[in-house]
Regions:
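Hydrophobic structural segments
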Residues: 1-196
């Protein structure tokens, strides 16, 4: 049977932990590399509901985007939300792998998926962050172009459909859209960089 280590190694090949940003906490955060994993649940966050779903389907592993454990843990108790989740995972032999900024940055990761969903060709990064194991440049965010210039209202419609959302925050400057920048996650620090690139 497949082991947690096999799944971790597969995910690490797609989005190496070495790509993560310094503040982040990714990889196997709860569990045992040598435990078997017959079923896996994917989630954005490890919530109480996600843990209950994993238990109900008999999943031995949850793979989430956002880390369950972010800062230093001084204690693991049932009085604390994160502590309760960790206790529940351990009691039910459920491991947790988190792939956060490494998945955002990786080739084919979150930022590339966003560009693809919007129909844009990737031309570069908002900010270089280093090189991968093969020596290829990697970075935060993506910059690219649509196949043709379109009106702002049409671009908003594409965004709503691609992201499956009913609402967007925007400022209509009355301009057409051709070049764009995306940044998975908060991205507030990259707003100025995006203005340089587009």
């Amino acid at each position: 049977m497949t082991k947690i280590r096999d799944i971790y190694d597969f995910l690490n090949a797609l989005a190496p932990v070495s790509l993560k940003m310094d503040f982040d906490n990714v990889g196997l955060l709860v569990g045992d590399y040598d435990a078997e994993a017959g079923k896996c649940l994917l989630a954005l966050d490890i919530t109480d509901e996600v843990i209950q779903e994993a238990k109900s389907i008999g999943a031995e592993l949850i793979v989430s985007h956002h880390p369950l454990i972010f800062g230093a843990i001084k204690s693991v108790t049932a009085d604390d939300l994160t502590g309760r989740k960790i206790i529940e995972l351990i009691k039910n032999d459920i491991s947790a792998i988190c792939m956060h900024t490494n998945l955002d940055i990786a080739q084919g990761g979150v930022n590339d998926a966003l560009m693809s969903a919007l129909g844009a060709n990737v031309q570069g990064f908002l900010e270089l962050s280093g090189k991968d194991a093969e020596g290829n440049e990697v970075g935060c965010g993506r910059v690219g172009e649509l196949k043709s210039e379109i009106g702002f209202a049409e671009f908003l419609s594409i965004c709503k459909k691609a992201l499956n959302t009913g609402g967007l925050r925007y400022h209509d400057a009355g301009k057409k859209v051709k070049r764009l920048a995306v940044m998975g996650g908060a991205g507030g620090s990259c707003i100025a960089l995006s203005l340089i690139h587009i």
